[in-house]
């Protein structure tokens, strides 16, 4: 039988083309499935990293497996949308554990690494000094010690007052700057006033501001930010109610959570919102729910 070689070669060529296309299709499917699988793995890693970051930053501890799974189950259906992240963070901010950590973070930050035991130890020392004053009928010593005790007591009650929403972070930080521990760290009026500007306003005072601040604390009297003051409590009231303080809080929040200073728009908007609402948690929610924080 005679073979039609022309037809035979055509058949072979078509078979090769069909086989090649089939292989390419198989390969394409495999690659696509592989990419989807890799994307899913990355998504899981990102969500777990986000969960751990939130718990460490807000509660000072790592999230448990149960907590991570709960966050994953809430974020996965929305592809970790900003709205779903916002909801998760809002559920954490405002809990009792959050306020306890907020207090401990601040006393460590502003009282040179102090903890609750440091505060109670300092109070015991003042109680002992008061007892010595009472034994010697030394009224000056008694009043000095009692004043110190009262100021530390105002620090000790901070966590409960925050939970009860009696006051917010501005009052907490004012109390942390007005006690024997802070005084010992920043001894003398020049050091004390300068440290207040650096620690809470995130800038150094101008020479005029520094001099006026010292005059107020030394009861000479002066004007700071357009407000008259005569005493150290007056100075602290002026600082912690000023627009400059809220500017500093915005700077502090960005440095703490995304390790940079806010840009001009972020600084302006954050400060205006804080001055208007005194809602520090809203500022934190804005930063913590951002894509920048999620992807850092």
Sequence positions of predicted segments:
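Bacterial Sec-dependent N-terminal signal peptides
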Residues: 1-33
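Composition-driven recognition of low-complexity segments enriched
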Residues: 21-296
């Amino acid at each position: 039988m005679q073979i039609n070689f022309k037809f035979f070669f055509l058949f072979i060529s078509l078979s090769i083309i069909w086989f090649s296309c089939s292989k390419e299709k198989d390969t394409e499917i495999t690659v696509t499935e592989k990419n989807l699988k890799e994307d899913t793995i990355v998504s899981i890693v990102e969500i777990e990293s986000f969960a751990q970051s939130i718990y460490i930053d807000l509660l000072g501890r790592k999230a448990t497996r149960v907590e991570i799974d709960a966050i994953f189950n809430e974020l996965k259906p929305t592809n970790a949308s900003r709205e779903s992240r916002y909801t998760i963070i809002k559920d954490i901010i405002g809990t009792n554990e959050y306020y306890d950590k907020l207090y401990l973070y601040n006393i460590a930050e502003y009282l040179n690494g102090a903890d609750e035991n440091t505060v109670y130890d300092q109070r015991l020392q003042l109680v002992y000094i008061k007892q010595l004053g009472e034994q010697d009928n030394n009224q000056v010593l008694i009043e000095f010690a009692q004043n110190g005790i009262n100021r530390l007591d105002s620090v000790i009650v901070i966590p409960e007052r925050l939970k009860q929403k009696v006051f917010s972070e501005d009052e907490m930080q004012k109390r942390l700057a007005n006690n024997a521990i802070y005084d010992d760290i920043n001894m003398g009026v020049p050091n004390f006033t300068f440290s207040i500007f650096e620690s809470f306003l995130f800038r150094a005072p101008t020479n005029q501001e520094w001099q006026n601040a010292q005059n107020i604390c030394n009861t000479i009297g002066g004007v700071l930010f357009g407000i008259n003051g005569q005493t150290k409590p007056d100075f602290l009231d002026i600082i912690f109610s000023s627009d400059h303080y809220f500017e500093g809080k915005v700077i502090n929040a960005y440095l703490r959570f995304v390790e940079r200073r806010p840009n001009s728009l972020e600084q302006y908007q954050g400060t205006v919102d804080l001055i208007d609402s005194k809602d520090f948690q809203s500022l934190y929610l804005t930063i913590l729910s951002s894509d920048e924080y999620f992807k850092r």
